[in-house]
Amino acid sequence: VLDRIVGYKLSPFLWKNIRGGSSLSAGRVQSVAVSLIVDREREIQSFVPEEYWSIDAKLCEKGETSAFAAKLQTKNDEKFDIHNEEEANAVLAELKSVPFTVSGVKKSIRKKQPAPPFITSTLQQEASIKLGFQSRRTMRIAQELYEGVDVPGMGAVGLITYMRTDSLRISAEARAAAAEYIEQVYGKEYLPSSAKVYKSKGNVQDAHEAIRPTMPGLAPARLKDCLSSDQYKLYKLVWDRFIASQMAPALYDTVSIDIAAGAYGFKASGFTVQFDGFTVLYPYGDEEKSSIPKHAAEGDVLKVRELKPNQHFTAPPSRFTEASLIKALEENGIGRPSTYSPIITTIISHNYVEREGKALKPTSLGMVI
């Protein structure tokens, strides 16, 4: 109703006051989407980059040949900034005359939980990021998978549940089928200690389950010959995410080393995989493993292989992509699962916004309405 009220009030104003305005329209979600994109563009246009420097070290323990990376963090136990090359060179001069000593070692086990199954917004976001699909394309393919695909020996089969939903609810039958598949294919150790139940956010219309395969035991590889390329990619994305959501967490052995170098403090950190858990099927994140020495101890004197100053400039915020715009709308409680894709299509078709690669950029018209 709010969308209609806003549209009725604003659209006549646009028609009267902007050339060519008879083709213009406004609605609550549409207006917010354009406003977010325009505000971001203004931030980018007004952004003034600032110079700063960092110093990286490559260190190794005595008798070791492999080096590990550490970053300068503190001076006199406080965070500090290096603003220019002159300051960076002054710090380097001090560092070259002092020993590098391990001042602290922290070890821990970190647990990483799988992401929940998809809802409409997260499916659109992930398909954009991982598959390069625009939201309209994602929803069209999801509709095809939902309505049914001819599978040899089975006839027309709906392969995924309804794709317009904001609920994370999963039926007990689907959860049990996923657990059975996981145990058969990966082993009992890949099952969590208790069944995974995900809570939906408030104000959710719980008429439909989360987006999941209708038959969790029907792995994507079995369907590759009867699906189009796009259908296969999206089904695999939905299937992988759902099965992974019902798997055990990944476990990492983490190490953090503090290094004293005169008045300066460096830090090095890294991890090794203790148990891959759900990531055997659905890896995500951009963490990098590190060659941190496993047996480093407080008091160890380290050999300096390299000290490297690096110049940086602060960067403006990135333009919205479809994925990040949908996420922003969802986080601000704007719109419903069924509206995200049509809204993006509308603001582009009305020439308020245009695509520049994956980015969404306001047009000159979008900047003034």
Where in this protein do the model-derived segments appear?
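Glycine-centered small-residue hotspots that permit tight backbone geometry or close packing
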Residues: 7, 27, 270-280, 335, ...
